């Protein structure tokens, strides 16, 4: 009987080594490509971060981002008109007013605060959907020529900024002439000491019977507001005028103040003034976690105003 031929073990070994070698080469190639892919992902992430580098102090997750210093200025030819369609007002998930159009939010939510609001928990305020805060720098006394710094100015500035809330400022004026208004503006500038702001420094004049500035004429009040705002503007900040709907309409020549712009106070379900204002203070009875008692609530409409998407036609 013929014996079976024994297999050639040497040939099997050579083939096995060849196959293992090919597998190793493929595996090494795959691993060498992985760092390159990771590097590309990191590069893409960096590009995305770079694209967002222009965004300043943060807005809430549903609000319009802040990419530059906010200006309230309007064209003097448009100042006596309403550029908004108030049907676009909606309550957002924080129960704050928002201006919505075509599925986009064209507004920001804000507060204005002073020592009268006490100590503020700014982290809690941020978590209430607040994007910006107007902080009082000081005030002139109603019955005397005395200027007083707000006792919690520095605390409010630091707290808001630490929690990524955009900041502006305001001064409560009782100036009776342009020189006093310039002095008030210089006081504000000295207290801020070059502090970087996202929002304007606002001239707040609220005349009441018996106040030292109550009897001023429209021309005098306009000149006083211009003196304050131009001094602020000359120092590199934006400026604006705050007043109630009736006072803005009756106490100022608005076309002369249009280059600064307006912050309107009117406590109603929608503004009634035919004025191209930028910010609307819609209540002085707001409630927020982080602030004891009532607080003024505001909606910044500059994204709608400047984009031309607030058109009510």
Predicted features and spans:
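Gram-positive cell-envelope targeting signals
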Residues: 1-46
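Solvent-exposed, charged interface segments at domain starts and junctions
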Residues: 29, 33-62, 89-92, 178-214, ...
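Functionally critical loop-and-helix segments that line ligand-binding/catalytic clefts
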Residues: 47-110, 255-313
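Short, flexible, glycine/charge-rich loop motifs used to bind or transfer phosphoryl groups or to couple energy/partner
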Residues: 101, 123, 250-253
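Surface-exposed substrate-engagement region within the catalytic domains
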Residues: 191-201, 205-312
């Amino acid at each position: 009987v013929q014996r079976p031929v024994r297999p050639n073990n040497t040939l099997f070994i050579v083939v096995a080594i060849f196959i293992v070698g090919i597998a190793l080469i493929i595996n090494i190639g795959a691993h060498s490509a992985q760092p390159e892919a990771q590097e590309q992902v990191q590069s893409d992430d960096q590009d995305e971060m770079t694209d967002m580098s222009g965004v300043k102090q943060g807005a809430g997750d549903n609000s319009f981002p802040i990419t530059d210093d906010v200006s309230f200025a309007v064209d003097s030819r448009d100042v006596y008109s309403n550029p908004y369609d108030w049907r676009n007002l909606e309550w957002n998930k924080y129960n704050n007013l928002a201006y919505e159009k075509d599925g986009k939010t064209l507004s920001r939510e804000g507060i204005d605060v002073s020592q009268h609001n006490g100590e503020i928990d700014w982290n809690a305020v941020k978590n209430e959907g607040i994007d910006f805060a107007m902080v009082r720098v000081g005030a002139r006394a109603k019955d005397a020529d005395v200027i007083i710094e707000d006792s919690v100015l520095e605390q409010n500035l630091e707290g808001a900024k630490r929690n990524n809330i955009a900041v502006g400022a305001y001064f409560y004026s009782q100036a009776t002439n342009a020189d006093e208004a310039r002095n008030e503006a210089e006081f504000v500038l000295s207290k801020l000491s070059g502090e970087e702001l996202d929002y304007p420094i606002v001239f707040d004049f609220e005349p009441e019977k018996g106040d030292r500035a109550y009897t001023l004429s429209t021309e005098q009040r306009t000149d006083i507001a211009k003196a304050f705002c131009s001094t602020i503007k000359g120092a590199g900040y934006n400026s604006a005028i705050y007043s109630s709907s009736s006072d803005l309409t009756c106490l100022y020549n608005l076309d002369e103040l249009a280059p600064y712009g307006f912050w309107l106070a009117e406590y109603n379900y929608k503004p009634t003034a035919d004025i191209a204002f930028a910010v609307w203070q819609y209540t002085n009875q707001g409630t927020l976690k982080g602030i004891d008692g009532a607080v003024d609530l505001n909606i910044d409409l500059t994204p709608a105003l400047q984009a031309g998407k607030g058109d009510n036609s």
